[in-house]
């Protein structure tokens, strides 16, 4: 039998203090105080952009016209930080706020990640929405509900060919639409 080797891992202290509240309610508090942590989620991105600017932050395989995959497209920490800052400024320039957030229709891709980082830098909420609401649904009711609930100032989708029908059906003409590729007729 082959013995698998695993890297040793250290785990934090798991002791907790328990305080009872109302019947059936228990409050747990870790006994170990938190160590220093970044003030903002983007602080680590900024840190690594300075410490290891050329190191790969994210990557994806390029899709070929034949349906296969090509080379890897890498985004370094420095590129990601610069993109996040530029995107943040563009969001601020558009007047996006907590009342007018960004809705992301696309799945997990590099552009989605960079837009999310830009939103974090700018302090603008973003709402990653299940691609199925745009790609599987025929009535777009769930997508309409999301858009009505969060009142976006901007909707992002990676590919107009994939998301165009949903955008046309559900996104109001007063909401800016940003696409990575293609365009939606009338937008």
Which residues are covered by each model-predicted region?
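AMP-dependent adenylate-forming
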Residues: 15-29, 44-76
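Flexible, low-complexity linker/hinge segments
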Residues: 30-39, 183-187
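Conserved AMP-binding/adenylate-forming core of the ANL superfamily
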Residues: 33, 57-117, 134-144, 187
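Short beta-strand elements of ligand-binding domains
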Residues: 106, 158, 175-187
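Structured binding elements
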Residues: 123
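Anion (oxyanion) recognition and catalysis
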Residues: 120, 171
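Conserved ATP-dependent adenylate/AMP-binding module captured primarily in the ANL superfamily
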Residues: 128, 132-168
């Amino acid at each position: 039998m082959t013995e698998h080797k695993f890297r040793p891992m250290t785990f934090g202290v798991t002791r907790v203090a328990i305080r009872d509240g109302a019947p059936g309610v228990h409050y747990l508090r870790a006994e170990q105080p938190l160590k220093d942590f970044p003030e903002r989620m983007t602080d680590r991105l900024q840190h690594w952009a300075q410490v290891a600017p050329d190191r790969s932050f994210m990557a994806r395989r390029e899709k070929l016209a034949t349906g296969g995959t090509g080379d890897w497209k890498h985004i370094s920490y420095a590129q990601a930080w610069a993109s996040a800052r530029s995107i943040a400024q563009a969001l601020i320039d558009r007047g996006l706020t907590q009342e007018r957030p960004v809705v992301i229709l696309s799945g997990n891709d590099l552009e989605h990640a960079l837009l999310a980082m830009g939103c974090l830098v700018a302090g603008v909420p973003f709402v990653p929405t299940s691609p199925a609401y745009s790609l599987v649904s025929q009535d777009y009711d769930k997508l309409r509900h999301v858009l009505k609930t969060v009142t976006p100032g901007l909707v992002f989708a990676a590919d107009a060919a994939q998301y165009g029908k949903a955008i046309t059906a559900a996104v109001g003409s007063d909401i800016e639409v940003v696409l990575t590729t293609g365009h939606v007729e009338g937008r």
